[in-house]
């Protein structure tokens, strides 16, 4: 940033700090962009009269200032923070840095969009040599004070002194890991099982050892004044916005880099002051299933990070939260009934206020409840659907809000596979953990994030196994098919993140023992040591682990899904068709609500299942030496084309089906193997050498821009005739059966209106022949695929012959960018990483050029033919962001793969709702 801009940033007059607490606040829940989600909700809870520890929020704009100033603070910010600190002291009756009555604070990040665990938190700021004695005197609890101090040293050295400074750990051991190891060694030497068994004197000694280790490893003293700790923490939170894991999460969730994070400085309340103190995380409804039951976990004598970190199995909040792992642990409902009742009332008040499921963090200090956070809770796709429909039924939200509550990706998750119940029934169960995120996952074992990414990169499926996950594992968690951890509860990091992504996850699988050195894992119920690379299967709905590869199957549709989709369809104007190449695809798409087929590729009958005979006939035609021989070979092929067309039209009775004529270059179908060459040679009565010679003659330097699509049909009109005859014969036969077939014929790779006119003449001639032979009137639509820029730019002329356009955005993107779709992976990562482009244009439509060509094509075509139907049949037809754009430019329908049909239906409705506001 240049100096003038820095001056503008430094001296611009604006409010940088917003105070909250004492049942009042300067901000409110609408100010997410400025205060971040956490700050806005802390302000809103304060305004609602809830017990929120006082504090203040430094705005997201200050994050931009911090980076603009090269990691510094304006004088205005320093003054505003000082004033807010005084106001906080007044409410809490304590003073920051005071030797006798010290106020301690926490420092937490808060982006406007929830990023659980991706940025950093520091607790107990203000504990130093000057305040420790006063804190001990005031609380009468030296063990609590030194436990709080050791936590500060661990967090601050990790977040501020190492990560924020960009220091790479030596030998892969971060300062936090080294301090954790020191504490574990102390427990082992003393025979302690729990942290709470460590005595006050032992904790005091440990704190001194920690500080010495910090100096040894990081080369600087641990800060020993409250002021230094506070400003170091504020900077550490700002820097964590650009930490590796935060950047990786933003890439996955598509959160803009320039949003920045707010910083929330809040008075500390303590859950680690004894048996009448606790900390917990709760959800106003079950985040895994959507059930309308209060759900959560808590830990006695602990601080907030202990629950989320998943270091020990927490207690259940109530009866609804009990499972096989925590059934014998005391619930908050029975241990502290009055506190539980107050918390239950608060969750109902919050949910009714925000009209959405709330994720709540709370602390109980010596029997008093304090609310530390509320936010819209992450949930699985199944839970999102359940909650949306339940809240609609309860009158809490309207239909449009219900539609907007389920993300398109969550619908994808609902349709995700489950383990085949029949196979699962006879499989051997290895272990059971907590069902943190539902569905089935099958994959090979990996133990590190890096290994998971490597497997996924090679197209494999893996299960990431960890003691517990940390935010550093974020990319590996994304890459894995499923996640399995030894420790942690239903609100641990692994559970929260997996639920947000709809990824199968089991946590708290305590029977599992991991040996990282040997790269093995054993399950006490099985005994066998499983090595990295071996297959296991997870049932995330029940928390079950199996030591074998179990096949998966589609989750059955439930009435809730059907009812939800019926509401969705009321609010969209875009039609949704499917790309289907087989009758099976067509039937599946129809069950998902497809309104027709936008792309049936005739050449796909020559690939895959049952393709051997038609492919042999096609090869025979290709390798014939004369047109007479080719026509004879085509007559053998025609019945196969007709059969595929007829069965598809039958399934889609009364719905349009777009048949695209043969598109690929002929050389793609030339036999490669010696035995297939020999078979073809024998069929044609020529030598293998002659077959090879004829095959070689079809070779092109640049086949994707060579003899393919319409060019093939202009060069060999009888190939087009065969396809037209098959389509019209199938149509006539179905009409005679009393059905209502609706064929639409699409010519690919066109660049000229004359190409279309040439083909239309052949098509109409063949149609007339079939009508005469069958005494049946046939109705069809004739159109073209617009996939070359010239076709889009001359669309007014193309519409003379074409009754519909279907934009093939895959090739249109290829031709516009000059990127090869097959080779784009070699550089796309660098282009995205260096922000040369914002999105992969093959996944999300490029609105600046490709999108403009589509829009220009629509306008040009309709200037000639006002009733011209326009559709999309590229991969973009199933991309929610692209659908949102298509909804604004006059597209009539999008076409996508069968499993993306529900996603496209939802995305189209959401686009219409958002754009009509």
Regions found by a protein language model. Name each.
Residues 433-472, 523-563:
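Extended, non-globular alpha-helical segments
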Residues 2-427, 435, 460-463, 470-472, ...:
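Nucleotide/phosphate-binding sheet-loop regions of phosphoryl- and nucleotidyl-transfer enzymes
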Residues 108-109, 557-560, 567-917:
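Conserved alpha/beta-domain cores
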Residues 13, 24-32, 437-479, 850-867:
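C-terminal accessory/binding modules appended to enzymatic or scaffolding proteins
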Residues 368-370, 470-478, 482, 490-496, ...:
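Glycine-rich phosphate/ribose-binding loops and adjacent secondary-structure elements
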Residues 56, 486-488, 507-511, 600, ...:
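Short beta->alpha connector loops at strand-helix junctions that form conserved
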Residues 59-60, 64-65, 491-493, 512-516, ...:
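Short gly/pro/ser/thr-enriched loop/turn and capping motifs at secondary-structure boundaries
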């Amino acid at each position: 940033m240049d100096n003038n801009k820095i001056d503008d940033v430094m001296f611009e007059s604006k409010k940088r700090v917003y105070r909250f607490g004492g049942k009042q606040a300067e901000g409110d829940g609408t100010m997410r962009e400025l205060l971040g989600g956490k700050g806005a909700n802390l302000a809103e809870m304060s305004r609602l009269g809830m017990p929120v520890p006082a504090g203040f929020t430094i705005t997201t704009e200050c994050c931009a200032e911090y980076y603009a100033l090269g990691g510094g603070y304006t004088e205005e910010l320093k003054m505003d923070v000082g004033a807010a600190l005084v106001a906080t002291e007044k409410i809490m009756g304590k003073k920051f840095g005071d030797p006798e009555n010290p106020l301690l604070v926490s420092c937490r990040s808060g982006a406007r969009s929830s990023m659980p665990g991706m940025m950093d938190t520091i607790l107990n700021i203000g504990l130093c040599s000057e305040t420790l004695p006063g804190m001990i005197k005031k609380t009468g609890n030296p063990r609590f004070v030194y436990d709080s101090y050791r936590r500060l040293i661990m967090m601050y050295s990790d977040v501020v002194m190492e990560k924020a400074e960009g220091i790479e750990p030596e030998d892969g051991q971060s300062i936090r890991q080294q301090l954790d190891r020191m504490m574990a060694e102390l427990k082992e030497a003393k025979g302690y099982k729990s942290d709470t068994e460590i005595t006050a004197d032992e904790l005091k000694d440990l704190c001194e050892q920690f500080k010495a280790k910090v100096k040894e490893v990081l080369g600087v003293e641990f800060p020993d004044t409250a002021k230094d700790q506070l400003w170091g923490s504020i900077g550490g939170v700002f820097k964590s916005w650009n930490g590796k894991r935060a950047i990786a999460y933003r890439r996955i969730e598509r959160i803009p880099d320039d949003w920045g994070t707010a910083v929330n400085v809040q008075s500390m309340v303590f859950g680690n002051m004894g048996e009448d103190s606790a900390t917990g995380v709760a959800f106003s409804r079950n985040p895994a299933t959507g059930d309308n039951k209060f759900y959560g976990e808590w830990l006695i004598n602990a601080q907030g990070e202990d629950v989320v970190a998943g270091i020990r199995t927490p207690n259940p909040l109530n009866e609804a939260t009990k499972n096989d792992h925590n059934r014998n642990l005391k619930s908050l409902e029975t241990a502290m009934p009055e506190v539980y009742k107050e918390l239950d009332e608060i969750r109902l008040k919050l949910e009714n206020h925000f009209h959405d499921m709330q994720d709540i963090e709370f602390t109980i200090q010596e029997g008093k409840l304090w609310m530390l956070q509320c936010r819209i809770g992450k949930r699985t796709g199944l839970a999102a659907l359940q909650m949306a429909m339940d809240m609609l039924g309860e009158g809490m939200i309207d239909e449009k809000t219900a539609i907007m509550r389920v993300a398109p990706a969550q619908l994808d998750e609902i349709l995700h596979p489950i383990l085949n119940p029949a196979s699962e029934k006879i499989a051997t169960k290895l272990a059971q953990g907590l069902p943190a995120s539902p569905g089935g996952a099958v994959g090979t074992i990996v133990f590190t994030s890096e290994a998971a990414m490597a497997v996924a990169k090679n197209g494999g499926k893996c299960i990431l196994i960890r003691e517990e996950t940390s935010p550093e594992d974020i990319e590996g968690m994304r890459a894995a098919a499923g996640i399995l951890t030894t420790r942690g509860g239903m609100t641990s990091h692994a559970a929260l993140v997996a639920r947000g992504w709809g990824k199968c996850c089991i946590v708290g699988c305590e029977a599992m023992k991991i040996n990282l050195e040997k790269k093995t894992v054993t399950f006490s119920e099985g005994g066998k040591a499983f090595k990295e690379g071996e297959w296991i299967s997870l049932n995330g709905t029940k928390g079950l682990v199996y030591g074998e590869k179990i096949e998966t199957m589609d989750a059955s549709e439930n009435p809730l899904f059907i009812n939800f989709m019926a509401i969705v369809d009321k609010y969209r104007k875009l039609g949704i068709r499917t790309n289907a190449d087989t009758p099976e695809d067509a039937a599946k798409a129809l069950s998902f609500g497809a309104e027709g087929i936008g792309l049936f590729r005739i050449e796909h009958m020559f690939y895959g299942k049952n393709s051997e005979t038609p492919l042999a006939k096609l090869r025979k035609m290709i390798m014939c030496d004369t047109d007479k021989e080719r026509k004879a070979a085509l007559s053998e092929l025609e019945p196969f084309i007709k059969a595929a067309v007829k069965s598809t039209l039958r399934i889609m009775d009364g719905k349009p089906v777009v048949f695209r004529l043969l598109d690929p270059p002929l050389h793609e179908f030339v036999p490669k193997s010696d035995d297939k060459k020999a078979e073809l040679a024998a069929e044609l009565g020529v030598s293998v050498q002659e077959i090879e010679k004829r095959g070689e003659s079809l070779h092109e330097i640049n086949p994707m821009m060579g003899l393919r699509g319409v060019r093939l049909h202009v060069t060999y009109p009888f190939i087009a005739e065969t396809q037209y005859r098959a389509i019209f014969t199938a149509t006539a036969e179905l009409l005679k059966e009393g059905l209502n077939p609706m064929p639409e014929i699409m010519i690919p790779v066109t660049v000229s209106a004359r190409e279309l006119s040439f083909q239309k003449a052949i098509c109409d001639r063949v149609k007339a022949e079939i009508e005469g032979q069958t005494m049946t009137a046939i109705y069809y639509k004739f159109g073209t695929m617009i996939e070359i820029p010239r076709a889009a730019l001359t669309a007014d002329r193309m519409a003379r012959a074409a009754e519909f356009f279907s934009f093939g955005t895959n090739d249109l993107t290829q031709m516009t960018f000059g990127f090869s779709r097959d080779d784009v992976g070699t550089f796309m990562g660098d282009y995205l990483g260096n922000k040369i482009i914002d999105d992969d244009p093959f996944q999300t439509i490029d609105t600046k050029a490709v999108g403009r060509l589509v829009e220009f094509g629509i306008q040009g075509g309709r200037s000639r033919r006002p009733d011209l139907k326009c559709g999309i049949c590229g991969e973009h037809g199933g991309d929610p962001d692209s659908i949102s754009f298509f909804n604004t430019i006059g597209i009539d329908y999008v076409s996508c793969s069968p499993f993306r049909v529900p996603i496209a239906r939802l995305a189209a409705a959401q686009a219409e709702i958002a754009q009509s506001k």
